[in-house]
Amino acid sequence: MKKFTQVTGVVAPIDRANVDTDMIIPKQFLKSIKRSGFGPNLFDELRYLDEGQPDADCSKRPINPDFVLNQPRYQGASIMLARRNFGCGSSREHAPWALDDYGFRAVIAPSFADIFFNNCFKNGLLPIVLEEKEVDKLFEETLATEGYQLTVDLERKKVVKPDGTELSFEVDEFRQHCLLKGLDEIGVTLEDRDAIGAYEERRKAEAPWMFLGVQ
């Protein structure tokens, strides 16, 4: 998993509440269990004028020029600004996969659906909850300023505006540690490999019968 320490990037505003996971990555793209390759189909039904199909060449599809991600001012965005209840709907880990594959490192919103929120942390994507009035102000500033950028400092738990204003956010200490170190669940376990190895050796001495036939 990629480390997340500090990210500065262009902000892309998705100005609608209750964006569900089917909107983020439609159901026809869920057959793959690889974590990569979903970026071109992120927000597929909003981003293109035709119906998306798996394995279609997205570079040849007609785009919706009014959609945020197709507008030149938001190209290369790495921070998404969203409204309340982002990521609601059915549980699909493909949703954070698609956001990550597109290039987003953080999503800022007043609230998130619980399962989506948890899946983000497992895939190196930082979901940031700010007060609704703070999000409203960020939308106002993002829409008014072309190339509007924010800095997300995970270590300090701050969102920093271009004028230096800092907005604080909360994040669980364990999840913060995992993102800062780039650790998924397996990586966290391997941090204790020495202790695990020592325990196994001790158990082999105490109860050798448990390890009969174990290579």
From Swiss-Prot:
GO biological process, one term: L-leucine biosynthetic process
Domain of life the protein comes from: Bacteria
InterPro entries to which the protein is assigned, alphabetical: 3-IsopropMal_deHydase_ssu (IPR004431), Aconitase/3IPM_dehydase_swvl (IPR015928), AconitaseA/IPMdHydase_ssu_swvl (IPR000573), IPMI_Swivel (IPR033940), LeuD (IPR050075)
Key word Thylakoid present: no
Pathway linked to the protein: Amino-acid biosynthesis; L-leucine biosynthesis; L-leucine from 3-methyl-2-oxobutanoate: step 2/4
Pfam families per UniProt: Aconitase_C
UniProt KW keywords: Amino-acid biosynthesis, Branched-chain amino acid biosynthesis, Leucine biosynthesis, Lyase
GO cellular component: 3-isopropylmalate dehydratase complex
Matching HAMAP family: LeuD_type1
PANTHER family, per database record: 3-ISOPROPYLMALATE DEHYDRATASE SMALL SUBUNIT, 3-ISOPROPYLMALATE DEHYDRATASE SMALL SUBUNIT 2-RELATED-RELATED
Function: Catalyzes the isomerization between 2-isopropylmalate and 3-isopropylmalate, via the formation of 2-isopropylmaleate.
Family: Belongs to the LeuD family. LeuD type 1 subfamily.
Name recorded for this polypeptide: 3-isopropylmalate dehydratase small subunit
